[in-house]
Amino acid sequence: MPARDRDEGRLHGSADGAHGPDQDLAVLQAALLPAGVPILPRVAVGARYLLAEVDTAAGGDWYDTVVLSDGSVGLVVGDVVGHGIAASATMGQLRAVARHCLESGGSPAGVIAALDRFARDLDDAHTATVCVVVLDPTTGALRVSSAGHPPPLLLTATGPRYLGRPAGPLATGAAHAQAEDRMADGDLLLLYTDGILERPGVHPAQGGDDLADAATHLRERLDGGPAAQRFCDDVLALLIRSTGYRDDVTLLAAQRHAPLGTVELSLPDTPVAVTTARAALDTWLAALGVDDLTATAIQHAVGEVVTNAVEHAYVDRPGGPSTVHVHVELTETGVVEIAVADHGRWRPPSDHPYRGMGLTMAVDLVDDVRIDRLPSGTTVRLRHHPNRAVTLSTRPAGTPIAPMPDEPFLAALTADDDLDAVLVVHGPVDAAGAVELRDQLRSITGNGTVSRSVDLSRVTLLASAAVHVLYEARDRSTAHRERLHLLAPRGSTAHHVLELVGLHPLEQI
């Protein structure tokens, strides 16, 4: 399938349909994100990505799941300021750096440090946020590090809790620590972006409470098996059903569970062997949760190999041992490995035009086929790397469009020509408001040469673009040995966001 067709196929249509440049940007977004999440023996992974309709452009949310050589799993979610091609390109670069660091054995804190160094030389990555988790599925050990990103939510049998401590975004000079925790079987970890918290009309702190409540409720309704994908779908539907959403929303969930068993079969060299193998494999693949296309491909390939063994392995050894052995397992790194062994003699395909077609089909259906030919018998080994597709969605039918804010953005000084005057900011500081706020701050601080105070107590939304502007203004002031005082009382929208990203505000106004 051509790459563009594949990426367009990952886009789940909006309620109104997307066409033209917006569709092209969405296709770009799909091309820069992973096509799916791995299927693993001890941890179920699910993801959802909901594209924003406000700004009608591809955004900077991103995620990744990296299976490491020792079977550990790296989980990453990040958010780049802004929308459009620049944001998508930046998140693609950050994703590549994070993946390389994880595959090279980097710890979560090490990955954050590498991203921070990279972001210093890439303007569009300044104040990007990211959370990195490494999970050992065997022991349940968790390591977490974050740069200005909302903390991951761990759901356990005793209740929910958020992990880690807040620190500043990338390229802001913040120190990034690493926390440790542990997951038991059945526990579920959720990484996400702020789009699920900062829904229209919802205070960010309330958004965090809503997420914990919804996630706890939905986890209790899971039917006992691993259901990370359904969990993501249900959390998204429950939280945006009544409020709608403004920004991209990304969810990445991992649920630890008991290991998936193997399939071991010893079959007679009769046609019933094929039927028995297919039935056992069908049950195992259903427990694995692969999609229908993958299940069909694996079933077909195994059926062809078992048929070959039954029909040809023992034709010149009548009366001897005539058993076909089938072994199926999912490795710690997410590879389905199947071995079909017999004690007969390998017979290369004849010149007959229809001989050897079964093996040829098997080679085309799975990732890798190897044949071990020994005097004691033949073993055919099949390997296939399944994953669970992740759909990039626009607004699902029935979801309300984010309403326009009742209060417009406004920023004004309390008095003109007064160095003690405070810049008071009202309303939502979204991407458009951030541009105006940048101009205001440059003007009143003389590009950082005059100390000023900014009252953010009346802000109803402080988007990542606004955080970027505030960091820029703070750094300009610091460079000139001046101060930019950010005023936000505890409990306010701005206080919640500023604490999260490491721009600790003054609480007394």
Range-by-range predicted roles:
Residues V43-A44, A58, S146-P151, L260-T294, ...:
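Helix-loop-beta hinge of the Bergerat
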Residues A184-D185, L190, L197-A280, A286-T296, ...:
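C-terminal catalytic subdomain
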Residues D233-V272, D364-A421, A431-V435, S443:
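Flexible, glycine-/charge-rich segments associated with ATP-binding catalytic modules
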